[in-house]
Amino acid sequence: MTDSHVPHPESPAVEEGEERPHRRIKSFVMRAGRMTEGQQRGLDQGLPLYGLSLTDTPVDFDQVFGRSAPRTLEIGFGMGHSLLEMAAAAPEHDFIGVEVHSPGVGALLNGVLTQGLTNVRVYDCDAIEVLNRCVADNSLDRLMLFFPDPWHKSRHHKRRIVQPEFAALVRSKLKVGGVFHMATDWGPYAEYMLEVMSVAPGYRNQAEDNQYVPRPAERPITKFERRGEKLGHGVWDLKFEKVD
């Protein structure tokens, strides 16, 4: 019979009377993926040029980009198609992408290199850490969260990234007038996002009916989304503006 009081070998021992360290529930699962030649090129050549690392103090992004410009941060950019298209279409804007999966990071950076873009920077780590440690308060014009994992099962809802605490964190990083733009293709998650954001302090829903906005022209349609539309699947966009 195993002694239930023996600490896990990978965990530090906790003395009697001590509190166990709080482990934040993560909204993502690391998945292994095979790298294409282009993705590997993006990592090898692009990451040293355009990759950013976690810091203990907020980053001066004006210095990073060499200018002061409207600034967008996207969490979980996947393979980078939307972020790449948006950055190419708006060279007067600066874009910061955050993604934990290496093939996606490599794909985005390969595109950045191929197109010669200079207005994109990338973090390949946990977005919550990036927001907490690297992004100054009141510094973002827009934060985008497109098609995050909906965590369908009820027991996994706590893993959804959109939570009251996350809404407050995003608000602290947005400028007044800045926008938190979300999109999902899972109806129940759209309702959940709307419920969380509608009661989050300091935001205004930009939808005229306080529900969902029509698909904004600036958000590119992905191949996945086009396929879903043909099958009759819906997509819901939410835009909440920081008002104070």
From Swiss-Prot:
- The gene name reads trmB
Q: Which InterPro entries does the record cross-reference, listed alphabetically?
A: SAM-dependent_MTases_sf, tRNA_(Gua-N-7)_MeTrfase_Trmb, tRNA_methyltr_TrmB_bact
Name by which UniProt lists this protein: tRNA (guanine-N(7)-)-methyltransferase
The source's superkingdom equals Bacteria
If you read the UniProt record, what top EC class would you report for this enzyme, in one word?
Answer: transferase
Q: Where is this region: Disordered?
A: 1-24
Q: Which reaction does it catalyse?
A: guanosine(46) in tRNA + S-adenosyl-L-methionine = N(7)-methylguanosine(46) in tRNA + S-adenosyl-L-homocysteine
* Task of the protein: Catalyzes the formation of N(7)-methylguanine at position 46 (m7G46) in tRNA.
Q: What is its EC number?
A: 2.1.1.33
Entry GO CC: tRNA methyltransferase complex
What is the organism lineage in this UniProt record? Bacteria, Pseudomonadati, Pseudomonadota, Gammaproteobacteria, Pseudomonadales
Q: Which terms in the Gene Ontology molecular function aspect does this entry carry?
A: tRNA (guanine(46)-N7)-methyltransferase activity
Which protein family is named in the record?
A: Belongs to the class I-like SAM-binding methyltransferase superfamily. TrmB family.
